[in-house]
């Protein structure tokens, strides 16, 4: 840190000298006066002298795996303090169309009804301004199941994930015994005019300079899956300063170069069907709270990985 330059900047800030920022920038090797002012402003922020304007507060939650989900009260410290709520995939377990034992399964439509209500309850509890949802590997279980049972021509009648039904399309539950049916409105209509809710129809999305992702790939080892995702997004040419990953059910944090990397953990009890003698590493419960400045850059000191 150039103490002489910092002293000069404070004098300029306090109007004790007549030099312009542009003149100071040329004198001390900065590309422009604006670049020097940004440097000085960053130093003052780091010293706690000034705050940030127009901050964006993001709560990233994932892997609820309804009906094994944790109660919404785990978010009690963030009620009314969130601008963007990101559901990072696997809100529903979709166990009835999985490969696991049938004795643990519940009807798929009932599970989807419960997942829909869980999402509504969380949104109404936290009260965010916007909601974004990305798809996890369990969200694709429905189309994977049908692709094995149904002719490929008929698959064109089906959306790819359960979130298409819950968020955008709505769905019916038919009771063939009583010959009745109930329609469950899509959440875009439930929250119409109240909260901006969007299903991204992809396994990742970008908000500011942060990438949120739920890959299908898994690599054992601490933050190994996140490091693989980091390389993948660099190869895509994406520019980002933060990577927040779902899927692994584990938590971790690291900084690689100038990029902050988080694994968010999960928000569910471990399904009993998935742990019968597999000797898998115990899962980590938690979520991630991120704060960005007006340019979408991470404010690290105000962001955190929450462990439950």
Where are these regions (language model features)?
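Core catalytic region of metal-dependent phosphoesterases/phosphodiesterases
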Residues: 61, 66-178
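Active-site-proximal loop/helix segment associated with metal-binding centers of metalloenzymes
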Residues: 149-227, 266
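Short, solvent-exposed alpha-helical "recognition" segments
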Residues: 38-51
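Conserved beta-sheet core of the metallophosphoesterase superfamily
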Residues: 216-306
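Short, amphipathic alpha-helical "recognition" segments used to contact nucleic acids or chromatin
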Residues: 1-19
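Active-site neighborhood of phospho(di)ester-bond hydrolases with catalytic His/Asp-centered motifs
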Residues: 60-62, 84-90, 132-137, 212-215, ...
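Beta-strand-turn-beta hairpins that frame and shape the catalytic cleft
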Residues: 51-59, 204-211, 256-259
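Short, basic interhelical loop/turn and adjoining N-cap
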Residues: 22, 26-41
């Amino acid at each position: 840190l150039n103490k002489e330059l910092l002293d000069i900047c404070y004098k300029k800030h306090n109007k004790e000298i007549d030099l312009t920022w542009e003149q100071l920038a040329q004198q001390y090797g900065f590309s422009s006066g604006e670049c020097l002012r940004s440097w000085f402003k960053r130093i003052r922020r780091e010293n706690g002298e000034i705050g940030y304007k127009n901050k964006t507060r993001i709560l990233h939650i994932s892997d609820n795996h309804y009906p094994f989900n944790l109660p919404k009260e785990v978010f009690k410290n963030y009620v009314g303090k969130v601008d963007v709520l990101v559901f990072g995939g696997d809100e529903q377990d979709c166990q009835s169309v999985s490969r696991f034992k049938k004795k643990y399964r519940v009807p798929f439509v009932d599970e989807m009804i419960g997942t829909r209500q869980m999402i509504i309850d969380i949104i109404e509890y936290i009260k965010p301004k916007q909601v974004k949802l990305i798809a996890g590997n369990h969200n694709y279980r429905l189309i994977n199941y049908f692709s094995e049972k149904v002719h490929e021509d008929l698959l064109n009648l089906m959306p790819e994930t359960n979130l298409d039904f819950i968020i955008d399309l709505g769905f019916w539950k038919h009771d063939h015994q009583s010959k009745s049916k109930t329609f469950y409105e899509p959440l875009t209509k439930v929250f119409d005019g109240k909260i901006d809710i969007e299903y991204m129809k992809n396994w990742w999305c970008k908000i500011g300079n942060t990438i949120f992702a739920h890959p299908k790939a898994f690599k054992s080892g601490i933050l190994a899956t996140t490091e693989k995702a980091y390389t993948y997004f660099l190869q895509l040419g994406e520019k980002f300063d933060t990577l927040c990953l779902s899927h692994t059910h584990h938590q971790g944090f690291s900084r690689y170069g100038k990029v902050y990397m988080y694994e968010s953990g999960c928000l569910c009890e471990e399904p009993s069907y998935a742990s019968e003698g597999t000797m898998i590493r115990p899962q980590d419960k938690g979520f991630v709270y991120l704060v960005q400045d007006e340019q979408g850059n991470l404010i690290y000191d105000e962001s955190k990985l929450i462990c439950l």
